[in-house]
């Protein structure tokens, strides 16, 4: 079990508050490493739920001069992240910074944002390794840590109550640690090692007459397997692989975008032939 210092450092300190245009919630810092291209700066990444920052993603159909057709493109607006500094159990300061969405997946309800604040973040969450997921058991202790009703971060404890809940064809963990609106995007942490299992994303409600009762003890977080699927599909392996880095990940993402446009062009032309990427250079706005 985690001691008092570990509970602070692994469960509480990595949690942030997230504010978008029309929504708010929580986030979890998962990466803070020196920026190899900018001395004395760090690259800081937080995870949150896609529905928390959904207003920051604008989908528009625009004419693409390369493939000569209208193409749906996403345009990112910035969200605001509040990072908290602590003196033991007390908040010493709350620092607001803008952040840019670098990846999102509506299906998994997950997104990754890069903070504009480049100072080192000493406390980041550790995502549960893939080979540890199968060891999870009912009654395992968990902590839900987030900004309930957009309050400053705090944690509540409970246990795992269901290991594979299927909701709308998606897998979740269920837990009985109390959670409420505003916890979305906050962390659900394993209580023995402090691993980040998933992000709080759903709670149970029941309608009684004209009112809605919230079952705060029936919370759901993205299944940890889906966290790893998101990381792999979005080319964000640097979040869990020390041999990878942010800039390599962004290059892979840009290459996939370009390849997708090329394949769309040749499919539209009735030509499935593979092409050399060097033959078709596509200029795009790069991720922050």
Give the residues covered by each predicted segment.
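Short, conserved beta-turn/loop elements at beta-strand boundaries and strand-helix junctions
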Residues: 23, 32-35, 104-107, 163-169
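Short, surface-exposed secondary-structure boundary micro-motifs
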Residues: 49-51, 147, 193, 202
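C-terminal cap/linker of serine protease catalytic domains
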Residues: 1-5, 59-71, 196-288
């Amino acid at each position: 079990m985690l001691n008092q210092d570990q509970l602070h450092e692994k469960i509480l300190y990595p949690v942030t508050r997230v504010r978008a245009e029309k929504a708010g919630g929580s986030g979890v810092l998962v990466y803070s490493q020196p920026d190899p291209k900018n001395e004395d700066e760090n690259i800081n990444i937080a995870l949150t739920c896609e529905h928390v920052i959904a207003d920051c993603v604008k989908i528009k159909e625009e004419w693409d001069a390369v493939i000569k057709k209208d193409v749906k493109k996403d345009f990112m607006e910035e969200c605001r992240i509040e990072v908290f500094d602590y003196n033991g159990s007390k908040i010493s300061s709350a620092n607001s910074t803008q952040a840019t969405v670098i990846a999102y997946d509506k299906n998994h309800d997950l997104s990754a944002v890069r903070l504009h604040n480049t100072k080192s973040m000493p406390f980041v969450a550790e995502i549960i390794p893939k080979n540890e997921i199968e060891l999870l058991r009912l009654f395992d202790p968990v902590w839900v840590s987030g900004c309930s009703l957009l309050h400053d971060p705090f944690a509540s404890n409970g246990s795992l109550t269901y290991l594979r809940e299927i909701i709308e064809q998606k897998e979740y963990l269920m837990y009985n640690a109390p959670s409420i609106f505003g916890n979305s995007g906050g962390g659900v942490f394993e209580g023995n090692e402090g691993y980040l299992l998933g992000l709080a994303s759903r709670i149970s409600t029941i309608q009684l007459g004209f009112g809605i009762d919230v079952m705060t003890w029936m919370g759901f977080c993205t299944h940890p397997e889906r966290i790893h699927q998101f990381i792999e599909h979005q080319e964000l392996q640097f979040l869990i692989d020390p041999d990878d880095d942010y800039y390599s990940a962004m290059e892979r993402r840009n290459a996939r975008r370009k390849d997708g446009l090329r394949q769309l062009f040749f499919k539209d032309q009735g030509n499935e032939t593979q092409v050399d990427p060097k033959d078709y250079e596509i200029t795009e706005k790069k991720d922050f």
